[in-house]
Amino acid sequence: MIQFLLAAPRSGSGKTTMTCALLMALKRRGCAPCAFKSGPDYIDPMFHRAVLGVESRNLDLFFSAPETVRTLYAKGAAGHGAAVCEGAMGFYDGLGGVSDRASAWHLADTLGLPVLLVVEPKGQSLTLAAELNGLVNFRTPSHIAGILLNNCTARMHVLLAPMLEKEMGLPVLGFLPKPVSYTHLRAHETSAHL
C-alpha cells in the first residue's frame, strides 16, 4: 500500500492543497486512497472529503494513546490502496508549541510513515537547503523521505530540484505552480503537475 504523511516547516505552506492534489492524483490512478489528518482539526478533513467523497479520519496523539492511533489508522486504511495523512502546523510543532508531542513528526514516528515535506521556495534557493537540513536533522529518525515544492514556477523547479537533491540527498518529487487565483483552480489542474 502507498502510505505517507505530508508535513511542512510551518502553517500556510500548502499542505492541504498538496494533500488534496495527491489524493485526486491517486484516485485517478485507481489507488482508492483514504485520508487522515493529524490532530482534532475538522476543516481540512472536509476538503479531503470533497476530493474523495469518503470520510477523512483524525489521528490525535493528545487525545489517544499511540496504540489506539495505530489501530485507528490500520482500520481506516484497510481495503484502500493508498493512505495519505496530512500533518498540522509545522512538522515538529506539538503541545503548547514547545514540544514535539502530538506533532506531525510524532504521528509519523508512531505510525512509521515516510514524510513528504511541502515547502514554498519563496525568496530562497540555497538557504532553503539549509532550512531543510535543520528539519531533517532535528530528530532521529526524521522520517523525511522527499520534498514537494509549492507555489513554484516550472523554471524555479528546474533550478532548485537538482540543487536540493544534491544538498539534501532527498528526491524532489514534484511541484505545484502558483495559481493565478485559488478560486479558479480546479483539482485536475492542480494534480496534473504531480
Predicted regions and their residues:
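Short, structured patches in soluble enzyme cores that scaffold and shape functional sites
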Residues: 148-152, 176-177
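Beta-strand-loop-alpha "switch" segments that mediate conformational coupling across diverse proteins
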Residues: 169-182
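Conserved small/polar residues in nucleotide/adenosyl-binding loops
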Residues: 183-190
